[in-house]
Amino acid sequence: MKIAWIGTGVMGASMAGHLQAAGHELTVYNRTKSKADALLAGGATWADTPAEAAEGTEVIFTIVGYPTDVDQVFLGHDGILNAAACGAIAVDCTTSSPALAEKIAAAGEAKGIAVLDAPVSGGDVGAKNAALSFMVGGDAEAFEKVKPLFEIMGKTVVLQGGAGAGQHTKMVNQTLIASGMIGLCEAMLYAEKSGLDPLTVLQSVGGGAAASWGLANLWPRMINDDFEPGFFVEHFIKDMGIALDEAKRMNLELPGLELAMKLYTKTAELGYGRKGTQALLLALREINKG
């Protein structure tokens, strides 16, 4: 299948690599070309714009940074919807605004292009291991057509509803993670301060009621002072901002999410915005120096 892939960062490069390894023909675009080097070395074709990437392909995947990027990639002068063929399917895996997902889906429908919102969970580890969870919103027929592609990249693929439903589900996911990360990093700080060995602590708590993806994957990184990004702090702040905006629109108060937003904003202010979400530990250490 001819596939366009737009966005070859921490997540996108691995995801696209699985499709390439499965024998699909890729055309790729990324703002920084060097981040697509591995895919190009594997036989992918380079495109200079999202529109050029989309032209003549059957399916277009995108995973970029911010809603403004999504808007530009789809609706801009050199955007996907100005070049994709009628009957093509576009899939946005960026965590973005539900309202924007609905807007782009409607614009695509007017041109005969089905657009699915399909944000993912699982981080860099899930992307590398083809173990991502896809939360999908959009047309059911289009979903069934591209489901085999999702299954190459992930282990859980669920259609949640119409356009925007995938993004709403991702907001649920990020709300769960937000409070969980506070607990994870505070627990590490407590273990350190009390003189415990965090590794043996993990052996005790990792199989009980406190078990979680973060505990299994991020606790060992923190033990090794590895704060490199599986998911950037600055992108998590973006996600929480979207969730809080949606909550406000629905007249919801989410104090746990608001606290996480405050703490992660502090983390970014301390210079850790391009570190992984586990860098909240560094901010908590700073807070406790006072």
Task: For the regions a language model picked out, list residue spans one by one.
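Rossmann-fold dinucleotide-binding core
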Residues: 96-175
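NAD(P)+-binding Rossmann beta1-loop-alpha1 motif at the extreme N-terminus of oxidoreductases
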Residues: 1-62, 88, 93-94, 124
